[in-house]
């Protein structure tokens, strides 16, 4: 992954700004926050960041892909203890990273997980990509209904069999794409209880919306440098940012901007 010049913005620093990402020639990332008058119609998203469990790379890539339509704030797990935290957001989002069953309890007590569940019951939305999709499952936040996020690489006829950064074929609303993948999940369960937006080549659901919960196994937010260093063999699959548009469309369907 790339190195970063600056530390991530705090929740308060992101309160009235839209963050713009600039990738330099060494594929290092710096954050440039521009004071912006936020439209009242923009939905408010709280994006969790705790590097490396929730990767800076993944979080900032989500900001880059979604900040045109959403007011995005960065938050830390301790802020879930604030009774007023959810009063100021429409979507809570969890990016990819290396978080797993061993690290999860270090950040999220049952009380914090229950607060997220109550937020959803009250009309809030959840967005999870890769690790964030795993965390929607029964071993973690337990917010999905009859759906289990499971490792795609262990599924029958999976096109990827090891955990590494690569691309894999998906069918996104009828269009074949080679999308960035790093040990993401398939969403296995009763398909009558969710809408499938995208599938892996073996037919397993890859991106779904169930009520106010949207989860994605691959990385449509992936920026150009993920396709270049160090995995240069996937350069030819760079999509010119088209997958960012797919992600934006997905989130707009999950939580419309107007």
What are these regions (language model features)?
Residues 2-18, 24-29:
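Short, positively charged low-complexity motifs
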Residues 39-88:
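N-terminal beta1-alpha1 cap of cysteine-dependent amidohydrolase-like domains
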Residues 91-97, 213-217:
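Structural motif
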Residues 161-226:
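Catalytic beta-strand/loop cores that center a nucleophilic Ser/Cys/Thr
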Residues 100-102:
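Short glycine-rich, flexible loops that bind phosphorylated cofactors or substrates
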Residues 220-258:
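Extracellular ligand-binding/catalytic regions of CAZymes and related secreted enzymes
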Residues 48, 71-75, 127-129, 214-217:
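A structural signal for short, well-ordered beta-strand segments and their strand-loop junctions
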Residues 104-172:
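A glycine-rich, often tryptophan-bearing local segment used as a flexible ligand/cofactor-contacting loop or short
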């Amino acid at each position: 992954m790339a190195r970063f010049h600056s530390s991530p913005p705090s929740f308060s620093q992101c309160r009235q700004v839209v963050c713009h990402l600039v990738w330099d020639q060494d594929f290092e990332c710096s954050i440039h926050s521009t004071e912006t008058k936020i439209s009242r119609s923009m939905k408010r998203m709280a994006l969790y960041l705790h590097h490396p469990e929730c990767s800076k790379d993944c979080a900032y890539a989500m900001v880059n892909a979604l900040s045109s339509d959403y007011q995005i704030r960065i938050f830390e797990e301790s802020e879930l203890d604030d009774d007023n935290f959810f009063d100021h957001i429409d979507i809570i989002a969890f990016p990819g990273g290396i978080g797993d069953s061993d690290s999860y309890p270090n950040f999220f007590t049952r009380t914090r997980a229950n607060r997220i569940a109550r937020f959803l019951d009250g009309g809030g939305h959840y967005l999870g990509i890769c690790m964030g999709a795993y965390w929607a499952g029964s071993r973690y936040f337990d917010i999905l209904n009859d759906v289990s996020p499971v490792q795609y690489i262990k599924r029958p006829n999976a096109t990827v069999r090891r955990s590494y950064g690569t691309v894999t074929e998906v069918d996104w609303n009828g269009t074949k794409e080679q999308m960035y993948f790093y040990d993401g999940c398939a969403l296995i369960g009763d398909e009558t209880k969710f809408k499938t937006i995208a599938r892996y080549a073996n037919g397993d659901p890859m991106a779904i919306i169930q009520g106010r919960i949207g989860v994605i196994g691959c990385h449509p937010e992936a920026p150009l440098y993920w396709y270049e260093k160090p995995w240069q063999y996937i350069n030819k699959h760079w999509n010119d940012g088209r997958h960012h548009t797919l992600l934006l469309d997905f989130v707009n369907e999950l939580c419309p901007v107007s």
